[in-house]
Amino acid sequence: MAVAENVGVKVDSSNNQNIDNNTTSLVETKPSCSDDQTPKSKSSVLTNELIQRTSEVNLKSEISHLNPMAKEFVPSFLAQTHHSEFWGNRFWFTNHFPKQTIFLIGQFATMRRNFGKGRPWITKKTNLVQNEDMIKRTVYVSDIDNQVTEEQLASLFLSCGQVVDCRMCGDYKSILRFAFIEFTDAEGARSALRKSGTMFGSHPIRVFMSKTAIAPVNPSFLPQSKDELEKCGKTVYCTNIDKEVTKMELENFFKTVCGEVHHLRLLGDFYHQTRIAFVEFKLAESAISALNCSGVVLGELPIRVSPSKTPVRLHHSDLN
């Protein structure tokens, strides 16, 4: 914003005193010249002119530090170009007048005062837009039979559109569960609403437009190498395991029915009435066979088996 350069500027009287002293000394020490035609009666006029000029110079020097019309600083990587205000298809703000600003994600677009340093200026807004788009493509399915797997539920909705993700959730105290299903487009989600009331398993499901998007899987849980990716193809995720079933009993069951087990990790806590397990087989064919074991009763509860999204990562306790 352009402002009058002299508005609000104060010059200390001590500076004026210094100016007077310096100017007087300059006049007094001026060497005499034989060609000097200036009448001595005009010496006071000359002194006043020098004082005025010196004051103006110092005043302009003071104001230049605060002048919004001062010359714009140009980084060295921009100064090498012919036009410092335009570089790499980007326009930048200068102090002369505002120009169109085009900030590209991840490139010279960090927030001011280093808040959120290293992140794009528009990342938050972009994430909100992407999240809203995901919500429009997602449906919420309730009253799902607890024997139904994610794969079976996703297969039911394939006629509505391409399924991107299916996330099954539920309380261990309830015989029914719920799920979120994401499609590639909003049209698939709208078509899925027609499935509401369909008998699936032992209970009719209900389908609504979701108010939230499916939370992404923690990247640290996903395969981190080609070897772990291959292990996922041989691994199944088993849930609803009776707490009375031991690790040895579970391993013997899968070994007898499906094939040799390479690794098995059984997990549980005091808060849940059931446990979960990750079972890695020697062969991928054994893992495929294990999917057919979903619904088999071990102890007093039917287990649920689905393909694992993560490999088995053993702890020291699992090696004992």
Curated annotation (Swiss-Prot):
Limits of the RRM domain: 137-212, 234-310
SMART domains noted in UniProt: RRM
Biased composition (Polar residues): 12-44
UniProtKB keywords: Repeat, RNA-binding
GO molecular function terms attached to this record: RNA binding
Regions crossing the membrane: none
Domain notes: Contains a PAM2-like motif, which seems to be involved in the binding to the PABC/CTC domain of PAB proteins.
Coiled-coil regions listed in the entry: none
Annotated gene: CID13
One Pfam family it belongs to: PAM2
Motif extent (PAM2-like): 65-75
Protein name (database record): Polyadenylate-binding protein-interacting protein 13
Highest taxon of source: Eukaryota
Region (Disordered): 1-44
